[in-house]
Amino acid sequence: MDRPAVVLLSGGLDSTTVLAIAKSQGFTPYALSFAYGQRHAVELDAARRVATALGAAGHVIATIDLTVFGGSALTADIAVPKHDTVEDLQADIPITYVPARNTIFLSYALAYAEVVGAGDIFIGVNALDYSGYPDCRPEYVDAFQAMGRLATRAGVQGTELTIHAPLMQMTKADIVRAGLALGVDYGMTSSCYDPDAAGHPCGHCDSCLLRLNGFAEAGSTDPLPYRGA
């Protein structure tokens, strides 16, 4: 039986792993990505590669303009913080947090799910190596799921929405191991918040450091060509 599911796909390590997990669990994945004015728009090229390579049944890239609000180093003229080690990452919510981004993305996913007849949505949020983002916590996902069941025609008519966050309690190393076990080629992904024009990752933003640390702890080598490496 066909089990359609919407998978939020940025083109990064986490969302790519989630797409592979959804497929391994027997779902027919419909990928959803966003061109939201992010400075690291190279991730959309990665999302296209990933969706094709992992056999998504459909791939929508929705265009929304979050630069009208700004408020983040990813959508405004604000420098992306750089560090030398994972230990240097700040404990509070960083300036790379995009206001309400996951709420906006999940709202679009609700609409896409209704159109393709999906009762399942997958998102790659993580509560352990998550850089302090408030919309990556378990209580947030639970609350949005409850709202989604009330807010859609499908929910009212009896289709029970489930939001899957399979990476929630995994370390970045766990995520890397899981993806490699499923045959994911991480060389086609993009995680950096501040890549150069050729798409090479900086190696020093929060996302790069967490990714590199994850590969190191997993006993593997990140296949991406980092600047200056």
From Swiss-Prot:
It is an enzyme of class 6 (ligase). Pathway: Purine metabolism; 7-cyano-7-deazaguanine biosynthesis. One of its GO terms (biological process) is queuosine biosynthetic process. It catalyses: 7-carboxy-7-deazaguanine + NH4(+) + ATP = 7-cyano-7-deazaguanine + ADP + phosphate + H2O + H(+). Its EC number is 6.3.4.20. It holds the Pfam family QueC. One of its GO terms (molecular function) is zinc ion binding. Catalyzes the ATP-dependent conversion of 7-carboxy-7-deazaguanine (CDG) to 7-cyano-7-deazaguanine (preQ(0)). The keyword Manganese does not apply. Keywords: ATP-binding, Ligase, Metal-binding, Nucleotide-binding, Queuosine biosynthesis, Zinc. It comes from Kineococcus radiotolerans (strain ATCC BAA-149 / DSM 14245 / SRS30216). This is 7-cyano-7-deazaguanine synthase. Belongs to the QueC family. The keyword tRNA processing does not apply. Its cofactor is Zn(2+). Binds 1 zinc ion per subunit. SUPFAM superfamilies: Adenine nucleotide alpha hydrolases-like (SSF52402). ATP binds at L9, S10, G11, G12, L13, D14, S15, T16, T17, V18, L19. It comes from the Bacteria. Zn(2+) binds at C192, C202, C205, C208. InterPro entries: QueC, Rossmann-like_a/b/a_fold.
